[in-house]
Amino acid sequence: MTPARPLGAFGAVWFTYFAAIGLFNTYAPLWFKSLGLSLLVIGGIASLQSWTRVLAPYGWSWLADRNGQRIRTLRWASALALVAALALALAGPLGTALIVACVVLLFVANGAVVPLSEASLAHHLHTERGLDTARYGRVRVWGSLGFIVAVAAGGFVLQGTGVAAFPWFVVATFAALLWMALRLPASHDTVRPHARSEVGALQVLRRPAVAWFFASVFFTVLAHTSLYAFFSLYLDVLGQAKSAIGLMWGVAVGVEIVFFWFQGRWFERLTLHGWLVAAAGVATLRFAGVALFGNSLGLLALTQLTHAVTFAAHHAACIALIHRHFPGALRARGQALYSTLGYGLSGVVGGLAGGVLSEHLGFAAVFWAGSAMAAVGAMCALRAAHHERAAAPAP
């Protein structure tokens, strides 16, 4: 069994990383606005995170799998992120071009953290049956806690200090991330440099079960883009109070935390593909409910409770399936494909399409589209399960 100390180190990395992301994504637009940037420019800067996720995670993971040092690569990327955050704090008053350059560098560096830490943690949690999903949930929960603590505390702190202090808080969180990355155990997380598997990552991706799995990931996460990018705006247009909007987000993150912590108690009740189908199916109903009941906080709260299944259960099942399909030297690149196809490409497509839909048909149309995409994700998950069974050796 993996000792608690390495798992605690991974939990600390995820706490600080998601704290940094939560702080930046929530309050950076306010800082940019204080610098005199237009809403169009601020929106463009915000979209850079999705654009960099299309290539950066796979690039970092390819490098780590080739040099055989995932943790060391993660540490270098964390150091680069700290340099980018410091440069952003200093360059803020100097012009838009410098701000954009620093943000791009920051997001590119961040692209290493999730796939490399996920792959390294999976190495520590490997069992004869695959990934130990119960212990994985106990570690992953710290990322959710870091996010909600940073967003809540950041609001109170910036209320007192003023938004001008924002970039220095970002610097502090990325300094903490580097410190935690330096504490990660690296001695048992190496693959042979330049080791070549019998098949490459892209060859694995072309297998029907894997291709349908990633198609399901893409459409299910694409459906969630309606939530991440447009939920707050939708409720604001409907006249809901800012406190109510914050409460709705708190409900979602709260049930996410509960699921991750206790997932070992019920995760075995379905197959991994069964969880994918359940998550996408529930998401189909969830986003239809948001479209229909935006004026009812009670019903909206019920839809937010399903975040435990549509995000937390879906994510845990995805990580376990990637662990199964991409072993050994391919593991980091498998995690990177998840980041790229699931959260990079889907974020770009969802942001652009959602913007067009909301502009011409209103925000409710965005959530109806999200419901439709989730239904497609469920069908893709069913196809993935079919091909997985077909490829399994006969008993």
Question: Model-flagged regions — what are they?
Answer:
Residues 1-4, 184-217, 237:
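Juxtamembrane intracellular "pre-TM" segments in multi-pass secondary transporters
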Residues 15, 84, 95-114, 218, ...:
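Hydrophobic core of transmembrane alpha-helices in multi-pass small-molecule transporters
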Residues 55-69, 158, 258-272, 358:
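Helix-to-loop junctions at the C-terminal end of transmembrane segments
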Residues 79-94, 282-295:
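C-terminal ends and interior cores of transmembrane alpha-helices
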Residues 2-52, 210-248:
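Helix-loop boundary and gating motifs at the non-cytosolic
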Residues 32-33, 63-64, 141, 156-159, ...:
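Interfacial helix-cap and linker-helix signal at transmembrane-aqueous boundaries
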Residues 111-128, 313-326:
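Intracellular juxtamembrane helix-capping segments at the cytosolic ends
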Residues 165-182, 365-383:
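Symmetry-related core transmembrane helices of the 12-TM Major Facilitator Superfamily/SLC fold
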